A protein has these predicted regions:
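Long, acidic/polar, low-complexity amphipathic helices and coiled-coil-like
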Residues: 1-23
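Tryptophan-paired
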Residues: 12, 21-134, 159, 167-170
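Extracellular low-complexity, Gly/Ser/Thr-rich intrinsically disordered linkers
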Residues: 137-139
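Intrinsically disordered, low-complexity repeat and linker tracts
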Residues: 141-170
Length: 170
């Protein structure tokens, strides 16, 4: 309804989430994830898609997800889904707000910490941070052939279909 009271059909309205999500899957036998810390988790956003990271105080925080007990199993992976959220993080290389995920785990009864860096595979040097975009799910799978391996998969949040990062509009 307009200001003058006239009714008009504006067509379909497509809504998108303002947040992004990170899920963990542990397929590594003998490895137990005990804690996750999301470093530089964006806690503020804009209604419209920004072109750069918010540069105001309090835009990011470190958030801990303690007391996890994700026991690895190849046949039935331990999942930590729909618990880690944040807003877009468009930080560029060298900025203090580049996001990472510290995964604390035990492997063969020894404690370890692995830092997952979200890096753009299309960057020739492999050093450019991957923009964590709204409305996407970032799935981190922990596996093991000989040593523990950490892989990142970016999928559509709604239908969980894979796509190329090139397809994300910036």
């Amino acid at each position: 309804i307009s200001y003058s009271g006239e009714v008009a059909d504006c067509g379909e309205v497509s809504l998108r989430r303002l947040s992004m999500r990170i899920d963990l899957l542990n397929k590594a036998e003998g490895l137990t994830i005990t804690k996750v810390t999301f470093r530089n988790r964006a806690v503020k956003s804009r209604l419209f898609t920004p072109n750069a990271m918010l540069a105001e105080p309090g835009a990011v925080e470190d958030k801990e997800y303690p007391d996890l007990n994700l026991v690895g199993s190849f046949d039935v992976p331990a999942e930590y889904k729909s618990k880690i959220y944040g807003y877009e993080n468009l930080s560029r290389r060298g900025e203090a707000t580049v996001p990472t995920l510290d995964i604390e785990y035990t492997y063969l009864d020894q404690p370890y910490t692995h830092t997952v860096e979200f890096l753009d595979r299309n960057d020739p040097e492999g050093l450019a941070p991957l923009a964590l975009k709204r409305n996407y799910l970032y799935r981190i799978t922990v596996g093991r052939k000989v040593e523990p391996e950490f892989g990142i998969e970016v999928v559509d949040w709604t239908n969980e279909k894979s796509f190329n990062v090139d397809d994300i509009t910036f």
